[in-house]
Amino acid sequence: MRIGVPKEIKTHEYRVGLTPAAVREVTANGHQVIVVQGAAAAIGFNDDAYRAAGATIAATADEVFANADLIVKVKEPQPEEIARLHQGQVLFTYLHLAADKEQTEGLMRSGATCIAYETVTDPRGALPLLAPMSEVAGRMSVQVGAHCLEKEQGGAGVLLGGVPGVAAGKVLVLGGGVSGTNAARMAIGIGARVTVIDRSLPRLQELDQQFGARVHTLFSTTAAIEQAVIDADLVIGAVLVPGAAAPKLVTHDMVRRMRAGSVLVDIAIDQGGCFETSHPTTHAQPTYVEEGVVHYCVTNMPGAVARTSTLALGNATLPFVMALANKGWRQALIDDPYLCAGLNVHAGVVTYHAVAQDLGLPYRPAASVLGV
């Protein structure tokens, strides 16, 4: 199989779909890899490293898309990339379609088979290709939130860890999944007072066992969220409904009642965000202020630590890339129902129910397009 690795073109996105080490594994199995020149130069992987691993270096993205059977990326394709996709081609990347009807319709028109990292599952019901970036985003959320609380960034001038004689700041984490747990761990580590809200009692019990008295846990109700949001210095939105748009847990009225200079970090912004006042931002302009509250809503947070993120993501995606290449996409999905859960669009139709439901588009089950 011919596998294409383009350079990411989203603003301030430096991650890459395959590292030289991954390319070496793929080519050792008899596949051809085409990498656009400079695809990962920004994170220390130059073209010579890819050549040494067995890749062919292409001069342009057009060349990669025109010749590859399988495109391996990181972020959702931008409009000019969607225009390069063609019928019969397979795209393997993060898509986050439930909040992006324009992208979804573009992928439908392309005729390509589109497999989303974020909806691939495992036997435990977890999301193995989302987890590495959720870990990164969760840990980053406290880091960037603490920075945004500084006065020069528009924040209230609060040091989350406090100092002797001065109380530590209050961090509220909405969602106790992978990103929320990592956010809580980081916030605890710097000495903040941490509260996690989740709708799963078993998950709250696990967090209580993991962190003990260092974290307060609350069952998710509107009243609990409202009270905790208003009282917090930093609120981290880490809510996930796999493949679907994020629920708006924090209303405009709640934001209005927060203290001036408080900070919201919306990890869920890829799926539409979980604050009513959220809208996507970039690393170039990461924040804005609404109702006196600083909002950080960067859609590709892990791109800021692109080398770490690329290595972590590659560890998770490589086995699936190998399966797609060795078996062909159709047989790989038939053999692996967990990989099949990643199929979001095929030959002009949406094959992931939550995406179709959120966007009001026709739905066809993945099993029917596979003929099983």
Task: Give the positions of each predicted feature.
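An N-terminal-biased, well-structured beta-alpha scaffold segment characteristic
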Residues: 5-106, 110
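Residue-level detector of alpha-helix initiation sites
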Residues: 76, 136, 177-178
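Short glycine-/small-residue-rich Rossmann-like dinucleotide-binding loops
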Residues: 69, 75-76, 95-96, 221, ...
